[in-house]
Amino acid sequence: MRGREEVRGRRGRVWSALGLREGDCLSVMGSGGKTTLLRHLAEDTENDVILTTTTHMAPPGHPQDPPFLAFQNLERFRLDWAGMPPPRRLLTGRFQPGGGKLAGLLPEEVDGLADLPGLALLAVEVDGSRALPAKAHASHEPVFFSRSTVGVSVLGMQALGRRVMEGEVHRPALMIQRFGWSSGHRLELEDLERIAGAYLALLPPGRRILVLSQARSVPEDLLRDLARRFRDRVERVLGQSEDGLEVLG
């Protein structure tokens, strides 16, 4: 990638809110808005961007998805990339036979993408949450890659008021074990603080950002209250809605 400097091409509110620099590699983890964030990033710039995953993500076809380029191997991808005119904004991954998800790349393959000429941003989903707003992480995740420069933890605010049970949160049994809650426990703001703190503890070294997604599902005073609790723990706290990102702290 090019040197670590502010991105020079057109960029909008999402890139500015995240404070992105030329050549950043984002590890995006958590629940309730990771793929939405990646789509916002691709829509918000005229720079070259690649979106992918090290685990699984929704297959291409959403109206906000950038063009899809199937990943076969790094050499083939480099050739395809070199033959495309800028701006190159792509979603990549492997189709999983018989599955409804897009299969991810190996961490070393993601690292190889970081060296593509002209690439301004590499944004990578590194875990899954089955479209639920809160989760507990299993021992095999997140699946990070070594070139990551920014760790982004996403927490869905629709988790507020949900119960710790199947269909409400991802891996409720692990959540009960780790936080000492009972089955069916109703999540309050203090519980979301603990969940977000657990997410942040998993991030690799580097700049750290917390995104409170589904921001319009809760009163603004509660959203800002939760954001204030993390101001000394991360570089910035953002609220995410369908319209984009807002800096909360």
Predicted regions and their residues:
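N-terminal pre-Walker A segment at the start of P-loop NTPase domains
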Residues: 1-15
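C-terminal lobe/tail of nucleotide-utilizing enzymes
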Residues: 4, 200-249
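Walker A (P-loop) phosphate-binding motif
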Residues: 11-46
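General beta-strand structural signal in soluble alpha/beta enzymes
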Residues: 28, 49-54, 91-93, 122-126, ...
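N-terminal phosphate/diphosphate-binding loop that engages ATP/GTP or pyrophosphate donors
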Residues: 42-95
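Phosphate-binding/switch loop-helix module in NTP-utilizing enzymes
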Residues: 91-136
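G-domain G4 guanine-recognition motif of GTPases
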Residues: 126, 156-157, 178-187, 195, ...
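Inter-motif core of Ras-like GTPase G domains
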Residues: 138-160
